[in-house]
A protein has these predicted regions:
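C-terminal membrane-cytosol helix-exit motif in multi-pass small-molecule transporters
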Residues: 5-19, 215-223
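12-transmembrane solute porter fold
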Residues: 22-192, 196-215, 219-222, 226-227
């Protein structure tokens, strides 16, 4: 399945780049300032988030032997903190640069992974599990809101919908990739450490911590909201729809060679 997926993905890129007259995802969009770095940061952050959620639940149910009902109660903070995090992210947007809001979202998932990875096998819920769950509530909303703003400001009018949709899709890809890679880490550690289930879970969580740290570093170094010096809203459709913000060029001017 992995090989088939890679082949299909490669075929999609070839079609979009060489044959599609009106491509769904113009490859030139990835040449817009900060856009490619943003994509990687978002994917890795959602990977780390999914790892923290999956293995927190795994820890509670398999190590501490919680029932499904107890686990549901343990995750009840999401009902309160989740909506609050959306409001807080919206409040921060006009006051703090989007890349720093994203950094906050990455930072909380770093802490959440560490808190769960370092828990004793048996411990009161309030000591580490509760703060890890509360902190992780902020991550997806902060990252999603900030990424949508940065993506929309990185491309021109015509491709803002495409860029925004891609950010939403990365949530699903990140979750799947995160759990997949972390599961591999967990199984390999258990295999070579005498079947130690808890050690495997800790290793998976530290893997989530590591990729979140990389995402945070990339956010600090390369993710910015591109500056747009245009005044007003240009009326000429060919310019408005093709301009890639921050490059000073139209989309057709930065397309791949075969499209020039």
């Amino acid at each position: 399945m992995l090989i088939a997926s890679l082949v299909l993905f490669g075929a999609f890129l070839v079609w979009e780049g060489k044959y599609a007259k009106d491509p769904v995802m113009p490859l030139a969009v990835f040449k817009a300032p900060t856009f490619s770095a943003l994509i990687l940061v978002v994917v890795m952050t959602y990977m780390a988030f999914s790892i923290s959620q999956w293995y927190t639940i795994t820890w509670l149910q398999q190590v501490r032997h919680w029932s499904v009902t107890q686990t549901m109660a343990g995750y009840s903070p999401f009902l309160v903190v989740g909506p609050l995090s959306v409001g807080l992210a919206a409040w921060l947007l006009p006051r703090v640069a989007a890349q720093w809001i994203m950094a906050m979202g990455i930072g909380v998932v770093i802490v959440a992974n560490v808190l769960v990875a370092t828990m004793p096998e048996q411990q009161t819920y309030w000591a580490q599990a509760f703060p890890a769950i509360v902190l992780s509530c902020f991550s997806p909303d902060f990252v999603y809101v900030a990424a949508q703003l940065i993506a929309s400001n990185s491309v021109g009018r015509r491709y803002q919908g495409v860029a925004g949709s891609l950010i939403g899709t990365l949530n699903l890809y990140g979750n799947s990739l995160g759990i997949g890679f972390a599961g591999t880490v967990e199984s390999q550690v258990q295999k070579y450490k005498g079947g130690d289930h808890v050690l495997g879970i800790r290793a998976a969580l530290f893997f989530g911590f590591a990729i979140a740290v990389v995402a945070l570093g990339m956010d600090f170094l390369w993710v910015r909201v591109p500056k747009d010096n245009r005044e007003g809203w240009e009326s000429r459709e060919d310019q408005v729809e093709s301009l890639v913000v921050g490059t000073g060029h139209r989309l057709d001017e930065i397309e791949l060679p075969h499209r020039r």
